[in-house]
Every structure is written in C-alpha cells, then in structure tokens.
C-alpha cells in the first residue's frame, strides 16, 4: 500500500498540491518516505456546529483543515501523528450516521462520512496506517486520550450545577478534562494538564477536586519513598480560581468564513463520495 508510492513523482506532486492549497499558513509536508494515501471531505463536529473539513491521510500523519475554496485553498492546518491516534466507531442514530471518533492524547473529536462505505474505508485505511506506524516506531498504542468537547447545542444549562442557564450574557465554557459544558462559576479553577498544554487549563469543579486529590496521593507516595528532591509541589499544577478568560473558541475562529457552506444534510445530499484513496 505504501512502499511502491514512496519517492515517486506522482506522490511528490500530490503532496506539493496539498502544500500549495494550505499556502504559507501551513507547514511543509514533504518528507523522504512520506506517502499521501487518501483525501476527502468529512464533517467534523465542532463546538458550535458540525462543519465540513478537508482531511488528508499520509502513511505517518493525519492532516485536516478548513475549506476556503474546494481543491484550491485551505487554512487552519492541523497535523496529528498517527502513532497517537485511536479510532472509536460510534453507534448510528436517526439524526447522526456514519460517525466515528478520532482520539489522541491532546485532542479528540467526532467526524462523519457521506456513506457507510466511505466511513469504513476511512476507518480501515487509518487503522492500517496506525498499525504500520506503531510497528515501524516500536511504540505502544496510546491509552490516555483527551475527552471530546460536548457541543454547545447539547445543553442549555450547566452540566455540573444543573442550575445556571446559558444565554447571550451567560456564556458556555468547556472543562478541558471531561469536556462538559459548564458555567463560569463551575469552572473557576485551573490545573496543569501536561498532555494538553504547558499552561494551566480551565477545569470544572469536580475534575479539579479529583485531579487535586490524585496529585496529593502521588506526592504522598513520593514522600513515603523518601525522595523529597523529586517532589513536584501541588502548587505548581494547581493554580486555583481565575477570573481571566482562557481560549474557549479555537473552533469558532477556525470555522469563521464557513458561512457559505451548506448545512450537513445539503452537503451530502448528492450522495457523491467525497473521499479518494490512492493505491
């Protein structure tokens, strides 16, 4: 699937075309041995709503971005190393079909394809690439994954206190640990989550208590072992309450300018396959 395409002219041309579409805002993608295996449009469930995104499957990375002009211009490039990826198929419902979750240690999100066949093609190709990449690097599959953010529209009230009702004046926030939609009062705390960011992140009150308790247990074990020099003080990871706002709107900025795209139903109404895999 990979070897006969590596270092070929057609593969170089395909990768160069992807780089050109992202332009100066994207990172260089051409590397010795890297192969572009597939590409297509999937619907990504973002914080505000589901939006079409362009995806490119390479033998070692998964790349996706926002669509400005189909097959000509993309932006907001994201690169995910495949050895960090785990897939989770999601059950079908009347409102949501052909969905699966892409899980990594830093970010997890839900995507859907135009058809069951296309969904299965994406899943099988990604899983095969992940298997080969883990074999090549000798790494073990990732067992800890970031929680996917629950979409804003899923609830009108805080999912922790169940009392605060969201409005134009009372905004939603997301706990970076559990992904719940919470109010400002229920997410005043910050905690260092090294897998997600070098800076302390917003967490809900429940996750904060659990994380703080876990940290205290870890420090108690270190003290019991008699290794005070190796202690990481609780204060370095627990940052307490903060009235300042953090970045809750990556997807909103990423998706700005998508207003010209049709809704999810219209986008897939033609029944045309929006993905292609190279062999």
UniProtKB/Swiss-Prot annotation:
Gene3D superfamilies attached to this UniProt entry: Pleckstrin-homology domain (PH domain)/Phosphotyrosine-binding domain (PTB), Zinc/RING finger domain, C3HC4 (zinc finger)
Magnesium is among the record's keywords: no
GO annotations of cellular component type: early endosome; endosome; lysosome; nucleus; perinuclear region of cytoplasm
GO molecular function: phosphatidylinositol binding; phosphatidylinositol-3-phosphate binding; phosphatidylinositol-4-phosphate binding; phosphatidylinositol-5-phosphate binding; zinc ion binding
Predominant location category: nucleus
Zinc fingers (FYVE-type) by residue: 152-212
InterPro entries: PH-like_dom_sf, PH_domain, PH_domain-containing_F, PH_Phafin, PKHF1_FYVE, Znf_FYVE, Znf_FYVE-rel, Znf_FYVE_PHD
Top-level lineage group: Eukaryota
Keyword Ubl conjugation assigned: no
SUPFAM superfamilies, per database record: FYVE/PHD zinc finger, PH domain-like
Pfam families referenced in this protein's UniProt entry, alphabetically: FYVE (PF01363), PH (PF00169)
Keywords linked to the UniProt accession: Apoptosis, Cytoplasm, Lysosome, Metal-binding, Nucleus, Zinc, Zinc-finger
One GO process term, biological-process aspect: endosome organization
Residues binding Zn(2+) 2: 175, 178, 204, 207
Region (Disordered): 219-264
Domain spans labelled PH: 35-131
Recorded domain comment: PH and FYVE-type zinc finger domains are required for lysosomal location.
Function according to Swiss-Prot or TrEMBL: May induce apoptosis through the lysosomal-mitochondrial pathway. Translocates to the lysosome initiating the permeabilization of lysosomal membrane (LMP) and resulting in the release of CTSD and CTSL to the cytoplasm. Triggers the caspase-independent apoptosis by altering mitochondrial membrane permeabilization (MMP) resulting in the release of PDCD8.
Protein name as it appears in the record: Pleckstrin homology domain-containing family F member 1
Natural source organism: Rattus norvegicus
Lineage, highest ranks first: Eukaryota, Metazoa, Chordata, Craniata, Vertebrata
């Amino acid at each position: 699937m990979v070897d006969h395409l590596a270092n070929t002219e057609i593969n170089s041309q395909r990768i160069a075309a992807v780089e050109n579409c992202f332009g100066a805002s994207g990172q260089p993608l051409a590397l010795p041995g890297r192969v572009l295996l597939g590409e297509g449009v999937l619907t990504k469930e973002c914080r505000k709503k589901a939006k079409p995104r362009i995806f490119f499957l390479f033998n070692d990375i998964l790349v996706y971005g926002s669509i400005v002009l189909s097959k000509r211009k993309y932006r907001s490039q994201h690169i995910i190393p495949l050895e960090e990826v785990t897939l989770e198929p999601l059950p079908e419902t009347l409102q949501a079909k052909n969905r699966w979750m892409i899980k990594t240690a830093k970010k997890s999100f839900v995507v859907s394809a135009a058809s069951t066949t296309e969904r299965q093609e994406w899943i099988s190709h990604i899983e095969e690439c992940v298997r080969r990449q883990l074999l090549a690097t000798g790494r073990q599959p990732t067992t800890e994954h970031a929680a996917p953010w629950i979409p804003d529209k899923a609830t009108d009230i805080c999912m922790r206190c169940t009392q605060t009702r969201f409005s134009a004046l009372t905004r939603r926030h997301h706990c970076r640990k559990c992904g719940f939609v919470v109010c400002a009062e229920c997410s005043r705390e910050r905690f260092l989550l090294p897998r997600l960011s070098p800076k302390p992140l917003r967490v809900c009150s429940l996750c904060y208590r659990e994380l703080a308790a876990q940290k205290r247990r870890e420090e108690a074990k270190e003290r019991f072992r008699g290794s005070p020099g190796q202690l990481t003080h609780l204060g370095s990871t627990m940052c307490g309450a903060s009235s300042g706002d953090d970045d809750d709107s990556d997807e909103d900025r990423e998706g700005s300018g998508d207003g010209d795209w049709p809704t999810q139903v219209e986008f897939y109404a033609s029944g045309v396959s929006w993905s292609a895999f190279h062999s």
